């Protein structure tokens, strides 16, 4: 199903429909502040397994990421954040960044790789924020399978290609083509491990 959401003022009825789908273990394709992503409620193991199968990745080897609604929410899923790291995160979030951090016990086991790290995002996107508010759980954030092509910016074409694979495709307008910038914060020396759409300085 393709749902058309207003990018600046998402319809509450549709937000509830999306949250209900996620609570039931559904998989969605949704807009972010970068590219369209595959998502599910992180606490639904079968849904996470389904996304890993679509992506053809082993969750124990892959660096999986999920989105949170704010820094307070994010801090539940990582081990203690010291003051310098907190200040840096506060400077750059919400925004088009994924921060690799040590995973806390709150992170479902299936999402932890052998290093016990997790990628965390807070997208600067109203639809994302309001889905998270309605669901009240983080959402897995994975890129669409295959090569990133220009067609992946158009939700109508995304629906044609993936509509039979997922439960909902959310049309929030034209998406981007560049992914988030990924920063590894698991040591005292933070470093970029993937340069994406946004610049970053420690």
Predicted regions and their residues:
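Active-site-adjacent structural elements in enzyme catalytic cores
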Residues: 1-202
């Amino acid at each position: 199903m393709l749902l058309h959401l207003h990018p600046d003022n998402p319809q509450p009825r549709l937000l509830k429909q999306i949250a209900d789908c996620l609570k039931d273990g559904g998989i969605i394709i949704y807009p972010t502040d970068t590219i369209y992503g595959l998502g599910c409620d992180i606490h639904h193991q079968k849904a996470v397994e389904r996304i890993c199968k679509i992506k053809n990745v082993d969750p124990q080897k892959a660096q999986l990421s999920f989105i949170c609604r704010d820094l307070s929410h994010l801090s539940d899923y990582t081990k203690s954040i010291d003051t310098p790291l907190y200040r840096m995160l506060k400077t750059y979030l919400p925004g088009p960044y994924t921060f690799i951090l040590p995973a806390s016990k709150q992170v479902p086991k299936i999402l932890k790789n052998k290093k016990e790290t997790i990628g965390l995002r807070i997208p600067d996107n109203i639809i994302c924020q309001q889905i998270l508010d309605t669901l009240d759980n983080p959402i897995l954030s994975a890129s669409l399978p295959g090569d990133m092509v220009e067609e992946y910016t158009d939700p109508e074409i995304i629906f044609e290609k993936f509509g039979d694979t997922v439960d909902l495709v959310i049309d929030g307008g034209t998406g981007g083509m560049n992914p988030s910038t990924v920063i590894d914060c698991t040591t005292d020396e933070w470093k970029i491990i993937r340069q994406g759409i946004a610049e970053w300085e420690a």
